[in-house]
């Protein structure tokens, strides 16, 4: 699991928030030789230090040797000790175990209940609801990291907030959780209607002027291919 964490972090090293203020008192307790030889690549050291501080706060107790092994293999493009699909599974399990149960507004709860009651709807992980608009003929995407799709996105009131002008490629780790859940279950060639709870989309914050807080989203997605 620790190698999995490193592999994900190496692929997606984006800090969305500033780190908390450092505790300077600890610097005076460090052995003097640590300051004697400055790192040859200060940027690399800075990235490693920031990564270490973040992990110490968010995931204390990681085995450092396994952490560095996963980071090294992912960064160098070497074969990983754990298959990509297992990495995704482990990280999702950790996220679910450490994330508070999201609060659903009454309006969203009513909308999702009505959607769930529609004929042909089935529920996936995280409460994502899918229904088949066109049957697919191909295989599932398996451990693919990119998908080729056409889509249209709507709010609960039917207002279109986004749609593709033409088919587009997306990296799976760049889309919302609800999209990943649905796409992992879709066969190539299928067209699905996907209803995503706000907790699997943009949550309490929303997304700018387009998507309000606590908004469930509806997508019509055509899965054309993967790689």
From Swiss-Prot:
Superkingdom per UniProt: Bacteria
UniProt KW Isomerase keyword: yes
Pfam family, one: FKBP_C
UniProt GO molecular function: peptidyl-prolyl cis-trans isomerase activity
EC number: 5.2.1.8
Family to which this protein belongs: Belongs to the FKBP-type PPIase family.
Protein name, entry field: Probable FKBP-type 25 kDa peptidyl-prolyl cis-trans isomerase
Gene behind this protein: fkl
Record's function text: PPIases accelerate the folding of proteins.
């Amino acid at each position: 699991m620790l190698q999995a964490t490193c592999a994900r972090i190496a692929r997606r090293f984006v800090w969305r928030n500033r780190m908390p203020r450092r505790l300077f008192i600890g610097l005076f307790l460090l052995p003097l030789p640590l300051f004697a030889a400055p790192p040859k690549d200060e940027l690399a050291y800075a990235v490693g230090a920031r990564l270490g501080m973040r992990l110490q706060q968010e995931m204390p107790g990681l085995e450092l040797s396994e952490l560095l092994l996963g980071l090294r293999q992912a960064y160098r493009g070497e074969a990983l000790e754990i298959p990509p699909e297992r990495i995704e599974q482990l990280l999702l399990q950790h996220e679910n175990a450490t994330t508070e149960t999201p609060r659903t507004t009454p309006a969203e709860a009513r909308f999702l209940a009505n959607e769930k009651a529609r004929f042909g709807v089935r529920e996936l992980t995280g409460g994502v609801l899918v229904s088949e608009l066109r049957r697919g003929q191909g295989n599932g995407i398996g451990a693919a990291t990119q998908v080729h799709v056409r889509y249209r996105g709507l709010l609960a009131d039917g207002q279109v907030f986004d749609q593709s002008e033409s088919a587009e490629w997306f990296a799976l780790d760049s889309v919302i959780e609800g999209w990943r859940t649905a796409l992992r279950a879709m066969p190539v060639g299928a067209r699905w209607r996907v209803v995503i709870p706000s907790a699997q989309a943009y949550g309490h914050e929303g997304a700018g002027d387009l998507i309000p807080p606590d908004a469930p989203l509806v997508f019509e997605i055509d899965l054309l291919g993967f790689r």
